[in-house]
């Protein structure tokens, strides 16, 4: 940093992405806090959101998907395992917040806080259901390896039991039920673009010199692609057309700087489309049309993906101005509006080179087509700790031969 020049810092911690690792003293603080299970916790969070004004008055709490398990249906001998997984996650999150606080306090101590804009986004997607039934290894879901909780608990017993959760002995990930509760009041989770439980995140902005603090939640529909246009706007610079000889893509987002001082400012964002593994949606001027797609991220080793036909998907329609949580499908009442938005989605998908729809599903069905390292042999020694997945051997569902040269002292 040079005192006479502005600075830019992008800070993205690994938290609270899986696997969830944290010191035991942090996770122990949350013991007994979630004993009611995810259904009770979701209801409790919903009431607190209403009381704090975080969600609009009249918002409805959406129902659990029929393929998601209720807390009461979890076997009693597995509940302690499921609870401990969330204790670890909660400690992980709090520890992260403390580090954020240190960062802000450091800027304050150096005299930079007053004229520094801090944009704090609490995630990059909805809560992750990739722990599925609760897991000591998040890679089980990524590699579509069938497993049972009894198998995992038996393996856990060999390395320290529940105390091993949160340590480097395992790569634990909480049950998808906790993810669903973490996305209150919305439906669904990460990897679902049809519902805001898969895409929506809180954002807080601080700029003491220019923004007078207030507690009024902004209702404008924003997307992460609006961040850069907003920074360009307040700094007073233009988006470069050419960088290092390369023509740049057009900026998709819109500035929301006008909301800093006016909670009721016009929303310049008119349209935004979404697609994730064939789950898709499109926002336009207060309406949202979406279709769930083939993948339910919380279902272990899901069957039938090869039979999916995107042309047969059923679409829903939501009026977000009056239905914050997407609780009521209005497609039957407004078929013309739905048709309009479906056509808009196709135009946006074409404009953004999104075809073919659901291309990620193909790679789940045909892992041999995933881009991998060109190497066929690796040599590791004691200095090797971790390496990028795409540079490493494919250990998921591929056969490998391992040869170990070992010297054993007698």
Q: What are the residue ranges of the model-derived segments?
A:
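Short glycine/proline-rich turn/loop motifs
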Residues: 68-85, 206-212, 321-326, 383-385
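Short, solvent-exposed turn/loop segments enriched in Gly/Ser/Thr/Pro and often Arg
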Residues: 9-19, 61-69, 120-127, 133-135, ...
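Active-site rim elements
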Residues: 34-36, 85-91, 173, 188-192, ...
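Substrate-binding rim/cap in mid-to-C-terminal beta-strand-loop elements of soluble/periplasmic
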Residues: 105, 140-266, 313
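C-terminal, low-complexity/hydrophilic appendages and adjacent surface loops
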Residues: 181, 185-201, 274-331, 337
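Structural recognition of the beta-strand scaffold that forms the well-ordered cores
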Residues: 7-12, 117-121, 185-187, 203-206, ...
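Active-site regions of oxyanion-processing enzymes, predominantly non-cytosolic
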Residues: 1-63, 92, 96, 101, ...
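Extracellular glycan-recognition modules
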Residues: 371-410
């Amino acid at each position: 940093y040079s005192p006479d020049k502005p600075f830019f810092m992008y800070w993205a911690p690994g938290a609270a992405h899986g696997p969830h690792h944290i010191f035991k003293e942090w996770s122990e603080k949350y013991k007994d806090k979630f004993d009611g299970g995810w259904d009770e916790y979701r209801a409790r969070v919903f009431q607190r959101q209403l009381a704090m004004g975080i969600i609009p008055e009249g918002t409805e709490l959406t129902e659990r998907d029929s393929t998601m398990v209720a807390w009461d249906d979890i076997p009693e001998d597995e509940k302690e395992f499921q609870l401990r997984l969330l204790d670890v996650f909660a400690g992980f999150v709090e520890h992260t917040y403390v580090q954020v606080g240190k960062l802000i306090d450091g800027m304050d101590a150096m005299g930079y806080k007053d004229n520094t804009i801090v944009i704090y986004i609490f995630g990059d997607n909805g809560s992750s259901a990739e722990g599925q039934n609760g897991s000591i290894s998040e890679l089980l879901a990524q590699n579509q390896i069938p497993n049972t909780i009894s198998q995992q608990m038996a393996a856990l017993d060999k390395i320290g039991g529940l105390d091993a959760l949160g340590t480097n002995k395992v790569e634990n990930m909480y049950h998808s039920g906790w993810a669903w509760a973490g996305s209150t009041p919305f439906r669904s989770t990460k990897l679902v673009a049809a519902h805001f439980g898969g895409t929506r995140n809180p954002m807080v902005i601080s700029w003491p010199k220019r923004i007078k603090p207030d507690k009024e939640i902004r209702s404008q529909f924003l997307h992460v692609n609006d961040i850069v246009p907003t920074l360009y706007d307040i700094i007073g610079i233009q988006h470069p057309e050419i960088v290092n000889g390369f023509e740049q893509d057009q900026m998709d987002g819109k500035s929301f700087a006008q909301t800093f001082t006016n909670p009721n400012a016009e929303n310049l964002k008119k349209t935004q489309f979404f697609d994730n593994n064939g789950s898709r949606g499109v926002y336009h001027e207060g309406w949202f049309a979406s279709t769930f797609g083939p993948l339910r991220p919380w279902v272990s080793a899901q069957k039938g993906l090869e039979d999916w036909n995107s042309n047969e998907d059923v679409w829903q329609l939501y009026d977000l101005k009056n239905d914050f949580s997407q609780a009521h499908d209005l497609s039957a009442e407004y078929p013309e509006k739905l048709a309009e938005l479906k056509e808009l989605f196709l135009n946006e998908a074409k404009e953004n080179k999104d075809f073919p729809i659901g291309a990620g599903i193909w790679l789940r069905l045909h892992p041999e087509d995933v881009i991998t390292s060109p190497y066929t042999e690796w040599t590791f020694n004691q200095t090797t700790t971790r390496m990028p997945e795409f540079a490493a051997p494919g250990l998921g569902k591929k056969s490998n031969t391992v040869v170990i040269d070992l010297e054993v002292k007698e």
